């Protein structure tokens, strides 16, 4: 049982780290491409900014889903029920 709890905690940590790393890389790419495109065509900056914030919200939702799954695995571990 201790092995399952330990593996679940390690899996949750890896899940959170991957979500944080992916979100950070995604935000940096999104911001860089937004600055590049708004510098190339300044008249589209307002339209691009709106779309950038929508995509940033969707990108942030991915990490929030990962946090929810990790909290599920840590506090309500479904794998412990398989032992009985």
UniProtKB/Swiss-Prot annotation:
GO cellular component: plasma membrane; proton-transporting ATP synthase complex; proton-transporting two-sector ATPase complex, proton-transporting domain
Bilayer disposition of the protein: Multi-pass membrane protein
Transmembrane parts of this sequence: 9-29, 54-74
Record keyword Membrane present: yes
Keywords: ATP synthesis, Cell inner membrane, Cell membrane, CF(0), Hydrogen ion transport, Ion transport, Lipid-binding, Membrane, Transmembrane, Transmembrane helix, Transport
Gene3D superfamilies xref list: F1F0 ATP synthase subunit C
CDD domains: ATP-synt_Fo_c_ATPE (cd18185)
Residues marked Reversibly protonated during proton transport (site): 60
Localization in the cell: Cell inner membrane
Domain of life: Bacteria
Signal sequence bounds: none
Matching InterPro entries: ATP_synth_csu_bac/chlpt, ATP_synth_F0_csu, ATP_synth_F0_csu_DDCD_BS, ATP_synth_F0_csu_sf, ATPase_proteolipid_c-like_dom, F/V-ATP_Csub_sf
GO molecular function: lipid binding; proton-transporting ATP synthase activity, rotational mechanism
Primary location class: membrane
Keyword Transmembrane helix included in the entry's annotation: yes
HAMAP family, per database record: ATP_synth_c_bact
Subunit structure: F-type ATPases have 2 components, F(1) - the catalytic core - and F(0) - the membrane proton channel. F(1) has five subunits: alpha(3), beta(3), gamma(1), delta(1), epsilon(1). F(0) has three main subunits: a(1), b(2) and c(10-14). The alpha and beta chains form an alternating ring which encloses part of the gamma chain. F(1) is attached to F(0) by a central stalk formed by the gamma and epsilon chains, while a peripheral stalk is formed by the delta and b chains.
NCBIfam families named in the record: ATP_synt_c, PRK06876.1
Family stated for the protein in its record: Belongs to the ATPase C chain family.
Primary role: F(1)F(0) ATP synthase produces ATP from ADP in the presence of a proton or sodium gradient. F-type ATPases consist of two structural domains, F(1) containing the extramembraneous catalytic core and F(0) containing the membrane proton channel, linked together by a central stalk and a peripheral stalk. During catalysis, ATP synthesis in the catalytic domain of F(1) is coupled via a rotary mechanism of the central stalk subunits to proton translocation.
Protein name: ATP synthase subunit c
The organism of origin for this protein: Histophilus somni (strain 2336)
Lineage: Bacteria, Pseudomonadati, Pseudomonadota, Gammaproteobacteria, Pasteurellales
Gene: atpE
């Amino acid at each position: 049982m201790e092995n399952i709890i330990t593996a679940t905690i390690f899996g949750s940590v890896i899940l959170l780290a991957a979500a944080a790393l992916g979100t950070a890389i995604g935000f940096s790419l999104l911001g860089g491409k937004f600055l590049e495109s708004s510098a190339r065509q300044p008249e589209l900056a307002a339209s691009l900014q709106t779309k950038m914030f929508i995509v940033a919200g969707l990108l942030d939702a991915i990490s929030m889903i990962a946090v929810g799954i990790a909290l599920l695995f840590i506090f309500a571990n479904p794998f412990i029920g398989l032992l009985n």
